[in-house]
């Protein structure tokens, strides 16, 4: 048994990381400390003025662990890694831990390309971004390709190498064909320099140059060339308009601020690159209550830059905790100096005020929409409870369906709705293993048995501390089961539940002769529901969703089967070798006729795999 008092007395006087756990052994909070004994003890001292969030967390702490580190920076790095691994309930967690897209100019190549990427590496390329809007990156690259005759192929083209035949892009004037050695490296680099100028915000210089050339072309009566240059000027100006200039300097900077309403907090981030806003992003964190802004921003930075691909040169914030330590951590991650600054006045301060205003507006709009949706869903669940005469509102609803075509590839699906909203992360698919042919009842019995068998097994593992509560895929049981069918399907579900001594209400969703949702069957009776009411709309949505999910899984299995080849049945022939054989020999018949030497001439083939092919077609 965990002795809290004893463990608190024996905490070390060293830096490290502490992990708070609840009565299920689940990690609910990860923190770092300069001195472990001071930091951890603070949580359990009544004299401390804790925030509401910390008070709620402390009530749930059953035990804790700690890991000693050599320094505070090591503790910070370990803290970030453990938060990412365990996703604890009381840490700030960003739902969207994504890498933003960048525009990459591959300067390490003799003839560089302009591509989109989500990884920034030290490979000699020049990167522009990040861009929050992925479609914006795609649009800019497409506009660049229309304006500048640069290559788009992935070939390794070196100046002075053997010339190859140019592709269609050369024929239509979209590429200078470096592959055919039609342009020198130095001449091509001049084009790339213009692209870099454009992406760096110096598009006015390029426009001016194009205008001079357009005027010369018009004077020489080269009207077609002048029109082409005019179109390119329009494209360049369009790219320039996609990014609003708000600063005169050309640093890479992020501006981060927040707005709290006493319960929840919205963080807003503005990305400035070369003096231009290239994007902004917001994150809403619930139940922050009265946690102070400095702590919130410090925790947000750890989560945000722990997952994003790019750390800028300077980060501006209104206030922050552990500023020097976070700067050290960011610099280590970036592998070059990164600074956190708190502007007091001037242009930078004005931008932070603007960011905070955006955060306030975003949170208010979110709350308005959320409250409207919550009221709607609350009413639906309340009405559903009353219609079915349930003891409690069905917070978690699971719906099941079977899909098959002519008895082949029967599959089952389970969709989940929590508080009236679909929860795709809890959806599950089942491939039917024990039933041959089209038997929906037996198939349904199989998937329900597997669902609740897994659930009971996981619950036991959680109770035995062999599995964390958050790791269970089936351990949370529903308040209501909806079957896509009538009395037969309901009886199957009740039979399975009785086998496991589980008491969950089961309801059937029935359709009319036009395959439209008609009503519900519960306790052997059909309940007619107002077809224009919110409950009917909700039931129809659930029924459509479970059917869609089952059909999509069925299609994916049929798709895989349709691509089955004789080569799939040959030992030692995987996907790579299969593709290589078909690419080189063009057909199964040609592979059958191939000699041992011809098979070995394929780079991915070895002696054993060649022998397997010959043996198979003998």
From Swiss-Prot:
Superkingdom of this protein's organism: Bacteria
UniProt cross-references to SUPFAM superfamilies, sorted A to Z: C-terminal UvrC-binding domain of UvrB, GIY-YIG endonuclease, RuvA domain 2-like
UniProt GO BP: nucleotide-excision repair; SOS response
Domain GIY-YIG, first and last residues per copy: 13-92
Keyword Cytoplasm: yes
Coiled coil: none
Location of the protein in the cell: Cytoplasm
GO CC terms in record: cytoplasm; excinuclease repair complex
Span of domain UVR: 204-239
Main location: cytoplasm
SMART domains xrefs: GIYc
Oligomeric form and interacting partners: Interacts with UvrB in an incision complex.
Protein family (similarity comment): Belongs to the UvrC family.
PANTHER family associated with the record: UVRABC SYSTEM PROTEIN C, UVRC/OXIDOREDUCTASE
Task of the protein: The UvrABC repair system catalyzes the recognition and processing of DNA lesions. UvrC both incises the 5' and 3' sides of the lesion. The N-terminal half is responsible for the 3' incision and the C-terminal half is responsible for the 5' incision.
Name of this chain's protein: UvrABC system protein C
């Amino acid at each position: 048994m965990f002795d809290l008092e004893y463990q608190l007395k024996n905490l070390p006087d060293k830096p490290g990381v502490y992990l708070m756990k609840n009565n299920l052994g689940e990690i609910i909070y990860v923190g770092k400390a300069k001195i472990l004994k001071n930091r951890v003890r603070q949580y359990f001292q009544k004299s401390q003025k804790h925030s509401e969030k910390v008070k709620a967390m402390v009530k749930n702490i059953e035990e804790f662990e700690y890991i000693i580190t050599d320094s505070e920076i090591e503790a910070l790095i370990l803290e970030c890694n453990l938060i990412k691994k365990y996703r604890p309930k009381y840490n700030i967690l960003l739902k969207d831990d994504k890498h933003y897209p960048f525009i990459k100019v591959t300067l390490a190549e003799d003839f560089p390309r302009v591509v989109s990427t989500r990884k920034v590496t030290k490979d000699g390329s020049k990167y522009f971004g990040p861009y929050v809007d992925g479609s914006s990156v795609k649009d800019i690259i497409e506009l660049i390709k229309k304006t500048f005759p640069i290559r788009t192929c992935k070939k390794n083209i070196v100046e002075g190498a053997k010339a190859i035949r140019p592709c269609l892009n050369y024929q239509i004037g979209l590429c200078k064909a470096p592959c055919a050695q039609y342009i020198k490296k130095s001449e091509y680099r001049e084009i790339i320099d213009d692209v870099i100028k454009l992406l760096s915000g110096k598009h006015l210089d390029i426009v001016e140059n194009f205008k001079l050339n357009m005027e010369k072309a018009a004077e020489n009566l080269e009207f077609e060339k002048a029109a082409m240059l005019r179109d390119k000027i329009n494209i360049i100006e369009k790219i320039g308009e996609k990014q609003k200039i708000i600063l005169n300097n050309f640093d890479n900077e992020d501006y981060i601020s927040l707005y709290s309403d006493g319960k929840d907090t919205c963080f807003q981030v503005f990305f400035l690159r070369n003096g231009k806003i290239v994007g902004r992003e917001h994150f809403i964190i619930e139940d922050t209550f009265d946690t102070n802004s400095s702590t919130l921003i410090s925790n947000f930075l750890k989560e945000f830059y722990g997952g994003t691909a790019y750390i800028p040169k300077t980060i501006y914030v209104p206030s922050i905790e552990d500023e020097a330590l976070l700067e050290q951590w960011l610099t280590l991650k970036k592998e070059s100096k990164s600074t956190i600054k708190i502007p007091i006045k001037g242009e930078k301060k004005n931008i932070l005020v603007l960011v905070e205003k955006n955060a306030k507006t975003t949170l208010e709009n979110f709350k308005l929409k959320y409250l409207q949706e919550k009221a709607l869903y609350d009413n639906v669940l309340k009405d559903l409870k009353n219609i079915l005469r349930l003891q409690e509102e069905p917070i978690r609803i699971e719906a099941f369906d079977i899909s098959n075509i002519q008895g082949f590839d029967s599959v089952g699906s389970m969709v989940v709705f929590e508080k009236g909203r679909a929860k795709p992360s809890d959806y599950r698919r089942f491939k039917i293993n024990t039933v041959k042919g089209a038997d929906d009842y037996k198939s349904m019995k199989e998937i329900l048995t597997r669902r609740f068998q897994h659930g009971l097994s996981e619950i036991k593992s959680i109770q035995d501390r062999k599995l964390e509560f958050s790791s269970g895929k089936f351990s949370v049981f529903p308040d209501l089961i909806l079957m896509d069918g009538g009395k037969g399907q309901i009886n199957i579900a009740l039979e399975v539940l009785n086998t496991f001594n589980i008491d969950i209400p089961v309801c059937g969703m029935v359709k009319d002769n036009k395959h439209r949702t008609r009503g519900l069957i519960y306790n052997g009776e059909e309940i007619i529901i107002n077809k224009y009411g919110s409950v009917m709309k909700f039931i129809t949505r659930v029924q459509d969703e479970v059917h869609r999910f089952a059909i999509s899984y069925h299609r994916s299995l049929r798709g895989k089967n349709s691509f089955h080849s004789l080569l799939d049945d040959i030992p030692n022939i995987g996907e790579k070798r299969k593709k290589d054989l078909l690419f080189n020999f063009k057909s199964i018949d040609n592979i059958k006729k191939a000699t041992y030497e011809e098979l070995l001439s394929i780079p991915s083939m070895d002696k054993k795999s060649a022998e397997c092919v010959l043996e198979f077609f003998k």
